């Protein structure tokens, strides 16, 4: 069977259309490889009253889909028909005469024209995996989460945080929050027009509109929405024509009390090769950063993911992943998925030794061993204090604060215990280290300048 096709039984048009939409969503959410491995081999049998019946080609595929994807599939069916309460998956042969072939839609969001902005197709551009309910909140992201939720739940056309500007490193949750905003609005306010798009796609569509002499349609498409979300705005740096169009789109939407949500890998003030008037406007509303994960947040993310997947992972494996995969959430979840998939396909138990072997190449490629000594040197240099001050008993604020920051970074960036960290700082006990970490975490909640300072030092140390 063509991997871009789905086999359907002869059903009424509505059933066929719903199944077509569900398969397109599954394809978008999980990607071509996973879709072709599991969902492309599933047949739609019938829907009656509140039950949908699907057919898998083997017991193994049936059981795998039931255990891993049944909740997602049911949610997708319920989006298109909320009367559906159950999805059953069976295995049996279908007579060829009862089968009809439907090409899997290949249209991407970038291909949607202005005439389709009112359609529910836009709903399917939001990833069902990225909701507020499954976003793990911790000190590094709680402000961004709170304001994103406030924007989504705002009863007025526009929130007080307009525009909302989210910034932080790759894979830390900015895109998750943007999808969560989109999902929430479309579920609770389906009449509102919402566009989510990367800045790169915005530019490509603008160039295409110029080439095809469809600039007015382009303007109408983006300036008539209720909520416009642009991801990775740094992409338009140095692209003068795109900046000009974005500037006027921004002004039109803000003037008309329409909500804007922007994400970036840095704060507005740190953007280079972008017009000052755009920089200024990006900071008009609320600027919230999503900074690097803490060990505790990584633990929470792993535990949440494991619960969603309904699998058992030993605590020492979870601790190992949280300690070693520190770069971003995306890589952390990818490592967990790889370990679980290896166990499922090889029937081998998930153990620390197996995990280390499975992730050997990943760990080696990301191996930037950061030591407490590295951190002490970097922080001492940053704050113009002597390296010896890191282990001295001196309590002057100009020395104590950098020392606390170094302890905080040591906890985040190294696998060292509080006791071991304390030994590196003049044989301080673990309660002193704990107090320092807590103090810095409290400061990070309110001190934007300190947050940016620590984020910068973390990037330097990790790179």
From Swiss-Prot:
GO cellular component terms listed in the entry, alphabetical order: cytoplasm; plasma membrane
Taxonomic superkingdom: Bacteria
Annotated spans, Domain I, interacts with DnaA modulators: 1-84
Region (Domain IV, binds dsDNA): 344-463
Record-level GO BP terms: DNA replication initiation; regulation of DNA replication
Region (Domain III, AAA+ region): 125-343
The keyword DNA-binding is annotated on this UniProt entry: yes
Any one Gene Ontology molecular-function term assigned to this protein's record: ATP binding
Function: Plays an essential role in the initiation and regulation of chromosomal replication. ATP-DnaA binds to the origin of replication (oriC) to initiate formation of the DNA replication initiation complex once per cell cycle. Binds the DnaA box (a 9 base pair repeat at the origin) and separates the double-stranded (ds)DNA. Forms a right-handed helical filament on oriC DNA; dsDNA binds to the exterior of the filament while single-stranded (ss)DNA is stabiized in the filament's interior.
Protein family according to the UniProt entry: Belongs to the DnaA family.
Subunit details: Oligomerizes as a right-handed, spiral filament on DNA at oriC.
UniProt protein name: Chromosomal replication initiator protein DnaA
Gene: dnaA
